Amino acid sequence: MCIRDSHKVIKANNFKGNYIHYGVREHAMCAVMNGIALHSNLKPYGGTFLIFSDYCKPAIRLAALMKIGVIFVLSHDSIGLGEDGPTHQPVEQLSGLRSIPNLNVFRPADTTEVAECWQIALQNNQTPSVIALTRQRVSPIRKQFTEQNYCESGAYEIMRTGNDIKCTILASGSEVGLAIEVGHKLATRNIYSKVISVPCLDIFEKNSEEIKSKILDETNIIFSIEAAKTDSWGKYVGKKGKSFGVDDFGKSAPYKEIFNDFNLKGDEISNSISGIIND
């Protein structure tokens, strides 16, 4: 899944290539990449579905422990996978990967964030990276490229709907677009918010308390939106806020229907936030 036209496949009788067909061998793939990184100055990367990171976990953990900058590209990162159903829809995997010390778990929102997260991963030689990507198409969140890498702080403000801010909405990946939709819906009720894209919680946590507090604006009620288990966000939303996510196994259906079944839709979330703020 990571192959390009410029790549040449390594074969039994020809080792001059730069691409390995591992087959359905996720653990072996990640372990081999660790070996390549330890043996040379090469920067290996390989890909599989996020759900299969469970097969890769020992090798990913060792990459973090050994401080080598391997890049693990993990696609189909949520219930957005759709009809393949709960066996292939990751729910708890992001939380598990985020719990590994010295591992950066990136979940970019669009192509611009993908490029920025990729740059960070390439430049980091002592911390391995997971780059979690969607299956479904997502609309561009940032329409213009800038020299500044906004993802390098782990989280940044991507929208605010007014001056009298009542809440902060955190989101990652494909749900950043949903958070923006929720922000606009709340604004029609005179509830103004700021939306924070959080491509990497691990990097965000390394900021000073002052910077984290400034980004979160902890004087507001904080909410989070992510199509995965919500336990990554509890420390931020606290008792006043709420996390919108997926705390059960998924379902087999078109992805939009599954998002609706888990109430991950603009109207439902904006109604819930409005009720909490006006309570």
Q: What are these regions, as identified by a protein language model?
A:
Residues R4-D279, ...:
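Thiamine diphosphate
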